[in-house]
Amino acid sequence: MTPSIPTVAVVLKRFETPDEVRHFTRGVFELVTIGGMTIGRATYQPGWRWSVDVGPTVGSDRCRVEHLGLVLQGRAAAAFDDGRVWELTPGSLFHIPAEPHDSWVIGDEPYVSLHFLGASHYAK
């Protein structure tokens, strides 16, 4: 009798073929669901600002989604209503709490980041 070999299911996905895409002025948010987790890739062009380019779509001037992510390219700022402003740069791992905040691209280079937490609720 030949012993049975367990089957291992490996799933590979790419952001080039996302499960969902959310478009807005000067930006796009691509979502891939894998292993029960939704991961987002944000790509924002210079001049992008959450309160201007996403806010009107969701009916708010501030984002209220919690984020855990990694900056791949470009720079952005995240600002809270109490005056705190944080700069996000390539290689930065970031956690932004669900308190109201605005965000914008800094400089002339597109900003790209991965979002591991909050992606399914972002820009919705």
Language-model segments: which ranges?
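Conserved short histidine dyad/triad with adjacent acidic residue
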Residues: 41-62, 97-98
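Ligand-binding loop in jelly-roll beta-barrel domains
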Residues: 97-123
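Glyoxalase I/VOC metalloenzyme domain signal
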Residues: 6, 46-48, 117-124
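A short, N-terminal "cap"/entry segment at the start of jelly-roll beta-barrel domains
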Residues: 1-43, 51
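Residue-level recognition of conserved beta-strand positions in structured domain cores
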Residues: 41, 80-82, 105, 115-116
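Glycine- and acidic-residue-biased ligand/ion/polar-headgroup-sensing regions
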Residues: 37, 56-82
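Short acidic-glycine-tyrosine-enriched beta hairpin
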Residues: 80-99
